Amino acid sequence: EFMVLARFLDQAGRDKSAPLAGPSTLSQLSGFFGYNNFLPNDAPNGNAEQPAAPVTLPISQILGLPNDLRGGVTGPCPYLPVKPELLKRWQDALSEFSKPWIGIAWNEAQPGLTLDTLLPAIRSLPGTLVSTVWDHSRRQLSGHQGIIDAGAHIKRLDDLAALLHALDFVVGPDGIILHGAGAAGTPGLVIAQYMSPWYWYAETDRSLWYPSMDVLKAPR
């Protein structure tokens, strides 16, 4: 959800010193976007530290407005921060492999989308498959040849952001990788649940919030 919100923060008329409140798990991500005044609302007495807020409207409720009232989404995109030196490092590292460079992501276990479930649908694609997974889910790569294990070199969000900017396409389930690809303006396909969250709302299969992303919903 924060990755969607980050697209519009600069348009709120406040500088990056403005406080942001939310779960403590988002503190690193908010800092990545340059908002370092983060107030965790799930910490002891966390709510007491938060400034009084005016009338609020959750972004998800915007989708309930009529189209002519809601209007279009006009926030800037791409907006995922990237360090040029890291982007060049990924581009140089991948340059020996055929394009397009297709980033892939998967879930840790079923009933999520595992690598074994995803691969039959993408093996015939041209170019090079590049794993973007950096946690223990990388173990699913064992026994699969021909996939570049870029995740082994991802140590922080800066590395992931630069990789997502370097790739030509990204495919996988709902998660930070697909949100990041959308924020980077990288074309991609998210494989979402049939009753997908509001942030994967799509009109004619194209994501409302991430213009470069298509949304494929699982059957009922």
Task: Please describe what each predicted stretch is.
Residues 1-220:
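Catalytic machinery of carbohydrate-active enzymes
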